């Protein structure tokens, strides 16, 4: 899909800094990545609640939810996965511009795609959170029954079974959900945000 040459970017009269000042905190993307069943959605839900309790403005974008609307025309081929992440990256950037903490929970299996999202944001605005968990543990949890379907061949291109997952080399935060509770994981992230003076 080619971009039209007849479009112009229109800057807002209200800047990102203005919005951040009004909200009382910086705006960033907290990007959860990890295998299905590794705890991305579970931890991100609790993180959003914790930030709300701290009176910080945040909004959570979940992989399944987004595929009901914005990305419902995308499948799970490598090309569609790439486009899925590109769109979420752009939406996240808009949320950051609005002075909000964007929380995203997507498998986002390809390192290059995550790095592309990092590149469209300013330095320090992309916080990669790796929910580290073995395939065996994720499969044992299997909250949606997806691993069972993948093993039986019912689901093709399933990350961790028939499609690859590229773990981050240097994520800002790693939470090992086999050994850390949800509460401990959320505390780790909140502590990071405070130490970096984001909140």
From Swiss-Prot:
**KW Phosphoprotein (keyword) present:** yes
GO MF entries: adenylylsulfate kinase activity; ATP binding
Known Gene3D superfamilies for this protein? P-loop containing nucleotide triphosphate hydrolases (3.40.50.300)
Is tRNA processing among this UniProt entry's keywords? no
**Segment Disordered: which positions?**
1-21
Catalytic activity as recorded in UniProt:
adenosine 5'-phosphosulfate + ATP = 3'-phosphoadenylyl sulfate + ADP + H(+)
Which pathway is it part of?
Answer: Sulfur metabolism; hydrogen sulfide biosynthesis; sulfite from sulfate: step 2/3
Enzyme Commission number, as recorded: 2.7.1.25
**UniProt family annotation:** Belongs to the APS kinase family.
Query: What is this protein identified as?
Result: Adenylyl-sulfate kinase
């Amino acid at each position: 899909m080619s971009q039209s040459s007849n479009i112009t970017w229109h800057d807002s009269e209200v800047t990102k800094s203005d919005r951040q000042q009004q909200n009382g905190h910086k705006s960033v993307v907290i990007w959860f990545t990890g295998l299905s069943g590794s705890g991305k959605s579970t931890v991100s839900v609790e993180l959003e609640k914790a930030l709300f309790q701290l009176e910080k403005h945040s909004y959570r974008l979940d992989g399944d939810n987004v595929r009901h609307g914005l990305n419902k025309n995308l499948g799970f081929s490598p090309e569609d996965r790439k486009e899925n992440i590109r769109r979420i990256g752009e939406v996240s950037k808009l949320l950051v511009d609005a002075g909000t903490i964007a929380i995203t929970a997507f498998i986002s299996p390809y390192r290059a795609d995550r790095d592309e999202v990092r590149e469209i944001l300013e330095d320090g605005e992309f916080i990669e959170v790796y929910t580290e968990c073995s395939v065996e543990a994720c499969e044992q949890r299997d909250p949606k029954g997806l691993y069972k379907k993948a093993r039986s061949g019912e689901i093709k291109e399933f990350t961790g079974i028939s499609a690859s997952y590229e773990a981050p080399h240097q994520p800002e935060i790693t939470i090992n959900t086999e050994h850390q509770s949800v509460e401990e994981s959320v505390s780790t992230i909140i502590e990071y945000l405070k130490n970096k003076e984001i909140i």
